[in-house]
C-alpha cells in the first residue's frame, strides 16, 4: 500500500470513534468518517483544542461548530501545487490529501512519457489530479457537474501558477460529455475518474455508482 507521507502542510493527527483529527497548515479540524470503526483512546490533547468540529445531525447532514476563529479560506501546499482550503457544509474541505500518492504517480508517468499527453479527468472536483497532470506537462480536460467546484479548481490552478496551462474547464454530466467526445472523435491518452457513490449532474441527472459505473467505464474505452 502506498501512503501519502510527503505532506508538510497536512497531518492526520488521530482517529477514533468515527472521527478524525487533522491539521491543515495550522488549522485543526475534527471531521466525521464512517470508515473509522475502532474505538481506541484519544491520543492527542488537540481533540479538546481544535479550531472547528463538524457535528452530524440526527436528521441528516450537519454543521460546523467553531471553537476558535478561522479564516474563510486558506492555502496549503503539496510540492509545487497550492490548494485553497475552506470548510464546506458537507464536512469537506475541498481536498482529499490521501490522493497525493496518485498525483505523484500521474506526474511520474507523464514526465517519463517523453511525448505530449492528453488526459481526461472526470468527476474532477477541485482539481488535484488536474493540477498534477498539468504541472507535469499534460493537456487536461477537467470535467465536473458542479460549476462551483470547477471554479474552485480554476482558482487552485491560478494559485499554483498553472492558469496558462492547456486545461479545458468543463461543467457537464460526465457520461454525457464522454458520449459527445466520442461523436467528436476526440481521443485521450489517459482517463482519470474518482466518482462518488451518489450525486447529481448539472441538470439534476441522478448518479448512483452501482447503477452507472459499468456504462461509464465502457464508453470511456472509446476515447482511449
Where are the predicted features?
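Conserved SAM-binding motif I beta-strand of class I
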Residues: 139-144
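Conserved class I S-adenosyl-L-methionine
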Residues: 114-125
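S-adenosyl-L-methionine
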Residues: 146-192
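Non-catalytic substrate-recognition/targeting regions of SAM-dependent transferases
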Residues: 6-22, 29-97, 104
Amino acid at each position: 500500500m502506498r501512503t501519502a507521507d510527503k505532506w508538510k502542510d497536512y497531518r492526520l493527527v488521530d482517529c477514533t470513534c468515527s472521527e478524525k483529527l487533522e491539521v491543515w497548515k495550522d488549522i485543526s479540524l475534527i471531521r466525521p468518517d464512517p470508515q473509522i470503526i475502532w474505538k481506541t483512546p484519544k491520543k492527542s490533547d488537540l481533540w479538546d483544542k481544535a479550531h472547528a468540529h463538524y457535528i452530524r445531525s440526527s436528521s441528516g447532514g450537519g454543521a460546523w461548530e467553531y471553537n476558535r476563529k478561522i479564516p474563510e479560506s486558506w492555502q496549503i501546499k503539496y510540492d509545487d501545487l497550492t490548494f485553497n482550503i475552506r470548510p464546506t457544509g458537507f464536512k469537506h474541505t475541498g481536498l482529499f490529501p490521501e490522493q497525493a500518492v496518485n498525483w505523484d504517480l500521474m506526474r511520474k508517468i507523464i514526465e517519463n512519457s517523453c511525448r505530449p499527453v492528453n488526459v481526461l479527468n472526470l468527476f474532477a472536483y477541485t482539481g488535484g489530479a488536474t493540477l498534477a497532470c498539468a504541472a507535469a506537462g499534460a493537456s487536461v480536460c477537467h470535467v465536473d457537474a458542479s460549476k462551483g467546484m470547477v471554479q474552485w479548481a480554476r482558482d487552485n490552478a491560478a494559485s499554483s501558477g498553472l492558469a496558462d496551462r492547456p486545461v479545458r474547464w468543463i461543467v457537464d454530466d460526465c457520461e454525457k460529455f464522454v458520449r459527445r467526445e466520442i461523436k467528436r472523435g476526440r481521443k485521450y491518452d489517459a482517463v482519470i475518474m474518482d466518482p462518488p457513490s451518489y450525486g447529481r449532474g448539472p441538470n439534476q441527472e441522478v448518479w448512483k455508482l452501482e447503477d452507472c459505473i459499468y456504462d461509464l467505464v465502457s464508453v470511456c474505452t472509446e476515447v482511449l
